[in-house]
């Protein structure tokens, strides 16, 4: 069995969790390699909804191992809460089902305080952070002053690092006109207790995964957010604080690039975005609101309404290039049922010219207007369909046109929220 990376091909919220949940049956191990609890995966299995923010989606499959890699930033309060909820459901047992990297960095209370204070200070220039401390935690990681999971397991070391870092945080918050109310001894005790709660799951993930590969096990790497939010390749500065592209999958868990055999990009049949930043196909009219309502486009983590728009073929083609996508899975195709026409942006108009590739400068993207290609819509319900040939001809034509514009095969379509409401044309785990 090959090893497969699943990444978002848009601005996040593409439905990666559902596709990972579907593909987990073919993998032995599911690996989360970046991001934090700013991501939310909503899974519906047998009509029951489960929302996960840190633990990989594959945890709902008995007999599978789930790994949180060194590239993830962890709020231990959230991690322990998810562990407790999954245990209560009987979905998590203490048998090696969950593995957490000792080297994953820890989100501390000052990271959240700094995140919120900075966003408030930016006024109209807000990036749209979730306020969960993700960015400041990654900053501390790069500045070599962060705390890691392993630090929670040594209370004396934890106390020393908390004292050093809290002092710096107070200085920064004072410059932002904010204060950090912190009882350091109580904080150390609380985080040491959280450390004891996760100690049984914590290990050297690089060694653990290397041994899994030696045993012939197959890996499924689960990305968070999306390509257009990548800190290097997204619409900077309106991005997240980590690399969301496929190349980071192995970096974020301690393996080499030869561990990856197939890269699957997830794209909605339309598009959405949360927070600020350029979004050429955004619809601020009744059509946009219709997409929002039909698609349930409200954040799994924040609950805030998502911006909505037509599919952007330039952005999708960009995602194909920077991820080296082997195939695309299209989600929420059913949401487009009932539209008289459906549109795809096939170019951008800028200063009297038509561009066929997405500009690298977000300020230039802001000045672009989309050039649309219109296709006839369909009225048939899709939720009960299970094969490609069952799809209405117009829905098939839409998918094939997206495939042509993206330059890579659409290997699956989601036609409903439940795990089973999916048409898989080509299984990435059986593609080689």
UniProtKB/Swiss-Prot annotation:
A Pfam family of this chain: Adenylsucc_synt
CDD domains associated with the record: AdSS
Chief subcellular location: cytoplasm
Keyword terms: Cytoplasm, GTP-binding, Ligase, Magnesium, Metal-binding, Nucleotide-binding, Purine biosynthesis
Cofactor: Mg(2+)
GO molecular function terms listed in the Swiss-Prot or TrEMBL record: adenylosuccinate synthase activity; GTP binding; magnesium ion binding
EC numbers on record: 6.3.4.4
Residues binding GTP, per UniProt: 12-18, 40-42, 306, 332-334, 414-416
Pathway assigned in UniProt: Purine metabolism; AMP biosynthesis via de novo pathway; AMP from IMP: step 1/2
Binding of Mg(2+), residues: 13, 40
Cited HAMAP family: Adenylosucc_synth (MF_00011)
Family: Belongs to the adenylosuccinate synthetase family.
Quaternary structure and interacting proteins, as annotated: Homodimer.
Protein name: Adenylosuccinate synthetase
Protein source organism: Anaeromyxobacter dehalogenans (strain 2CP-1 / ATCC BAA-258)
Lineage: Bacteria, Pseudomonadati, Myxococcota, Myxococcia, Myxococcales
Name of the gene: purA
């Amino acid at each position: 069995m090959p090893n497969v990376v699943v990444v978002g091909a848009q601005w996040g919220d593409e439905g990666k969790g559902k596709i990972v949940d579907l593909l987990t049956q073919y993998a032995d191990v599911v690996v989360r390699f970046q991001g934090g609890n700013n991501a939310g995966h909503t899974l519906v299995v047998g009509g029951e909804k489960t929302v996960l923010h840190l633990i990989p989606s594959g945890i709902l499959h008995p007999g599978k191992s789930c790994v949180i890699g060194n590239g993830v930033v962890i709020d231990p309060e959230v991690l322990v809460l998810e562990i407790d909820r999954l245990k209560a459901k009987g979905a998590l047992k203490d048998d090696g089902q969950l593995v957490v990297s000792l080297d994953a960095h820890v989100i501390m209370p000052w990271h959240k305080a700094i995140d919120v204070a900075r966003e408030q200070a930016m006024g109209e220039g807000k990036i749209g952070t979730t306020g969960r401390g993700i960015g400041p935690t990654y900053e501390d990681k790069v500045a070599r002053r962060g705390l890691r999971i392993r630090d929670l397991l040594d209370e004396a070391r934890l106390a020393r690092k908390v004292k050093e870092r809290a002092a710096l945080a107070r200085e920064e918050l004072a410059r932002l006109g904010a204060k950090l109310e912190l009882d350091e001894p109580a904080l150390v005790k609380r985080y040491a207790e959280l450390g004891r709660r996760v100690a049984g799951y914590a290990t050297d993930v690089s060694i653990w995964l290397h041994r899994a590969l030696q045993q012939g096990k197959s890996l499924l790497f689960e990305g968070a957010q999306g390509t257009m939010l990548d800190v290097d390749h997204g619409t900077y500065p309106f991005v997240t604080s980590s690399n969301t592209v496929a190349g980071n999958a192995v970096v974020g868990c301690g393996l080499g690039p030869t561990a990856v055999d197939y890269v699957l990009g997830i794209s909605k049949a339309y598009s959405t975005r949360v927070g600020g930043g350029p979004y050429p196909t955004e619809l601020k009219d009744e059509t946009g609101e219709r997409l929002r309502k039909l698609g349930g486009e409200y954040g799994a983590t924040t609950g805030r309404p998502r911006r909505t728009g037509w599919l952007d073929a330039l952005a999708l083609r960009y995602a194909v290039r920077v991820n080296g996508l082997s195939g695309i899975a299209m989600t929420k195709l059913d949401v487009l049922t009932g539209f008289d026409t459906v549109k795809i942006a096939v170019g951008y108009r800028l200063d009297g010219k038509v561009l066929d590739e997405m500009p690298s400068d977000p300020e230039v993207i802001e000045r672009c207007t989309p050039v649309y290609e219109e296709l006839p819509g369909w009225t048939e319900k899709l939720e009960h369909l299970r094969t490609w040939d069952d799809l209405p001809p117009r829905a098939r034509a839409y998918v094939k046109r997206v495939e042509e514009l993206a330059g890579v095969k659409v290997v699956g379509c989601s036609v409903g929220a439940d795990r089973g409401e999916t048409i898989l044309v080509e299984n990435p785990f059986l593609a080689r």
